[in-house]
Amino acid sequence: MISENREMPGHQAWGWLYLFCTGLIGLLGTAMAALGGYIVFLGGTFYYLAAGLLLVGGALLALWRRHHAAPLVVFGIAVVLTLIWSFVEIAGKKWMPAWGFDLASRLGLIVVLVGVAGFAFLFWRTPARSSLRRGAVTAVVASVAALALLVGLHWERAEGQASANGATASTSTTLDAGRDWQAYGGTTLGRRYSQLSQVNTGNVRELKKAWSFKSGDFTPRRERIFYSSQNTPIKAGDMLYTCTSSNRVYALDPATGEVLWQFDPKVPADSMESLFSAACRAVAYFDDGAAEGEPKAAGRMPDVPAVIGSIPRGGSNCHRRVFVATPDGRLIALDAVGGYVCRGFGTDGIVDLTAGMGLRSPGFASNTSGATVAGGLLIVGQQVSDNQRRDSPSGVVRAYDARTGDLRWAWDALRPDSQAQLAPGEIYPRGTPNVWNVISADESLGLAFLGTGNSGADHWGGNRTEAEDKFSAAVVAVDLATGSTRWAFTTVQNDRWDYDIGAQPVLFDVEIDGVSRRALMQGTKAGDLFLLDAATGEPLRPVVQRPVPQTGKLPGDRLSPTQPQSTFYPNLGGMPGPNPEIIDGRHIWGVTPIDAAMCRVEFHQRRYEGLFTPPTVDAKGMVLLPGTVGGMNWGGLGFDPAQRLIIANYSRLPNIVDMKPRVDVKERPVGSGGARPDQAIAPHSGTPYGVSRPMWLSLFNVPCLAPPWGFIAATNVDTGELIWSKPLGTGYDTGPFGIPTRLKIVMGTPNLGGPLVTSGGLTFISAAQDNFIRAFETATGRLLWESRLPAGGQAGVMTYGHEGKQYVAITATGHARFETKLGDHLVVFALEGSDAPDLTGSPTKKPIGAQKQGP
């Protein structure tokens, strides 16, 4: 029973705790009511106003009748209201994955404050041996135990063995990677698939770290440089090649990680300041097949002249070469065996990529994805610093002879003749769409495939030409021999959202009406999966033109009234489904009711009409979902030819795009005394507007959109069916204000990095904002294995075979702008012991009488 004795010994502290909690509840209620009133005014939910008034009323009642339980009854009504409202909204969103996080954020702070207040009141107003006290203690203990049980049940764990025979029947050919991995995507087809199956679903639980390598290159020389190597190692012959954020190249022993040689191009620091991230996604490998006993190069074409340059210093003809591109505009040829510069390439071993570019600042345009080797050519695109100026450096793509370094062709949206040489003093057209990602090629078709970005200013295009719009956010097929355009497919018409092509095009065969055709699949930031005929660009699966919003169009700009949508495959830009996700107030989230309400206010103030909401100069801007990260990005897609599955990881993270009239933009662009790291507003010079486009985060530095913020999904390429999808990543290494929660509960984080698919029935991936590498069963999505990484794994996973053993490798160097832990590691895994099957998955037979060695 509740005592009327106000001076019961030892109870005063509980009384003060009760009053303190009710005071906090009152402050919380005041904030909720104030924000809630504004939300109602803006056309949103009444919940925050109603709950806030209840909490304020209960707090005032506690001050007036502090010895009575009536305030707790009012608080209890607020809790019940919150619970009902939460379930109604969460159910209205169809119980999205990670809905438990949504529920916890809605209820958590209110329940904790009310619970502590109620506990303190009971201990204040009841005798020491009261049954009410015992009941309260029991309830608290039971609640904590239940919470711990729920956390334990939802703790991410690998399930171990999936099936007795993990290897799938491979339909692979030499088009897929085997013991070697000679390109970013395994081969120039970009499948990120390996025929190796020694590691499979039946034994992946036994995968252990075999070795790791530290380059020492993880501390930028300046604070204005953002490191993220994003490197996928290349395996060719008996060497593994990797490069770092500052473009140091290392050749390693594939079995031990021992450094066989290293090369430091000594990149000037000022050339890295203009980069979004200082990255070296891959080196390029070329083998001209001239050396006796060496394999032929992947990609010699008879119609490309094979002219060998002068013999380089070092006693070798550089028949096998590794190429690295640097931010200061050098394409350097290195002997793959010895690591010295191949002097017969270009000028003393170097091709000057700044030639014809008219750069105003070092690094303004540079290659960060590596060259693609095909047809005896090195095909080189480049990133151009986003949103600096309309007359930014050209987006030209150039092809050089891999032996001599001679320029063979140069493709640009505004240069129809790719064979034309520049006149003395002439430069390539400024501001044209660039190709910053990994280029694919199919030598059987004689084509290279370019995924393009935008012209010099992403979010206003009133002064773009029709040709620039045609080749923006497009897949362009060019002739390998001449560089001439064969076909182009625009994925976003008149792109004003920075939905450039990030993912590498993927090539494979499909059967259409009983006829096998070479297809190209392109994943986009907007979430579409387009399947095109690789020879003609014709859509092989339905693509329809959907009407898109036109209201709020910026003066002088032009928008397309429709946008292409792939309707055969699910959209992978938000919650996976047949159409792009549309959010409303129910999807807005916060760690507490206060930041959640603030995010709701922002949502209702901003323009949002779904995908392709036009950029606006409205005071609060517009919500961009998917954001500039995507959707699908530079990690690329994985393709399993046996199971006919495309594996895609993607982010679900919104940005705010706020256009600023030129008079309000003080920042200077790169090339005119400006520096990208110093810009709060991207200047967009040469247009009427600057642009601010931060991620949409709350005051706790977490997204204003309820999780999941990242997924991995498998789609059948023949039927279009979404086979499985699941959130990718936990909150273990992230949290409010960037403080790790150490909760390994799947919520789905933003992710950058590529999958690896193997004929062992496995999909390996890191990419998420927690520092883990994972292996999923490709057929089902079940998590079978995971391992902790020493830093962020924002890179592509690869695999290779060496001396009878399969290895799985991931670069763990983190991503400065993604706020994952930085490092300098390459981590390599393999099966332990001598019982491993051979590289194709068959168990290795021991000789009769063979003995196990060691313990």
Language model features with spans:
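Cytosolic juxtamembrane helix and N-cap/initiation of the first transmembrane helix
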Residues: 2-28
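Aromatic-anchored segments of alpha-helical transmembrane domains
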Residues: 27-33, 77-90, 147-148
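Membrane-helix interface "capping/anchor" motifs
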Residues: 60-74
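Cytosolic-side transmembrane helix boundary signature
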Residues: 111-143
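Internal/C-terminal transmembrane anchor helices
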Residues: 130-158, 637
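Blade/loop signatures of beta-propeller domains
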Residues: 159-212, 413-418, 587-618, 682-686, ...
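Repeat-blade elements of multi-bladed beta-propeller folds
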Residues: 181-185, 225-248, 274-330, 363-389, ...
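Extracytoplasmic/lumenal domain signature
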Residues: 205-218, 249-276, 286-297, 331-362, ...
